[in-house]
């Protein structure tokens, strides 16, 4: 019996079926020729420190898209799609959001550590770069919360 079959047999009031969900997706901003964008975080999105759903992850080029709490996986996917649309429309016209987890063509020099206002956050990212290298931090993906 699969997990889906087991879940379908549960009473709808079962606590496991009352779960909430959240998704986080990291995307690199790249130019149309597949190189990392060298532009700053899109100003149309406002402050990355306070935007509830679109922030910056490790690098200046790495957007982090964050859904609010959803009450179903379908709702979480819908929210992520809407946030992705906003992000895609907010970046420079010569850029796109790289859809894969492995980065395109890049060198350590191409990766700009996020220009964050919070000194602790900046130092944290600089420490990651020294310990693991910038390329490893550029790997992007989806996180399920």
Give the location of each predicted region:
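A broad, structural surface signal
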Residues: 25, 78-92, 122, 126, ...
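Residue-level recognition of well-ordered beta-strand positions that form the cores
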Residues: 28, 66-68, 145
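Extended, Lys/Arg-enriched charged tracts that mediate electrostatic binding to polyanionic substrates
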Residues: 117, 125, 145
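Catalytic micro-motifs at enzyme active sites that drive phosphoryl/nucleotidyl and oxygen chemistry
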Residues: 13-16, 51-53, 121-136
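A short, structural micro-pattern
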Residues: 21, 57-59, 136-140
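Long, contiguous juxta-domain segments that are non-catalytic but functionally important
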Residues: 1-48
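Active-site acidic/histidine clusters and adjacent loop/turn architecture
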Residues: 41-117
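Histidine-centered divalent-metal-coordination microenvironment in nucleic-acid enzymes
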Residues: 26, 136-145
């Amino acid at each position: 019996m699969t997990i889906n079959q087991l879940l379908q047999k549960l009473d709808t009031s079962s606590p496991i079926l009352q779960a909430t969900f959240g998704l986080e997706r990291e995307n690199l901003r790249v130019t149309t020729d597949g190189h990392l964008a060298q532009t700053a975080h899109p100003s149309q999105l406002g402050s990355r420190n306070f935007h509830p759903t679109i922030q910056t992850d490790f690098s200046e080029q790495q957007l982090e898209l964050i859904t609010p709490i959803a009450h179903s996986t379908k709702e979480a996917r819908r929210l992520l799609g809407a946030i992705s649309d906003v992000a895609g429309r907010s970046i420079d016209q010569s850029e796109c959001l790289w859809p894969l987890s492995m980065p395109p063509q890049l060198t350590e020099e191409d990766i700009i550590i996020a220009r964050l206002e919070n000194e602790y956050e900046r130092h944290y990212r600089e420490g990651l770069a020294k310990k693991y290298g910038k390329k490893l931090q550029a790997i992007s993906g989806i996180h399920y919360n």
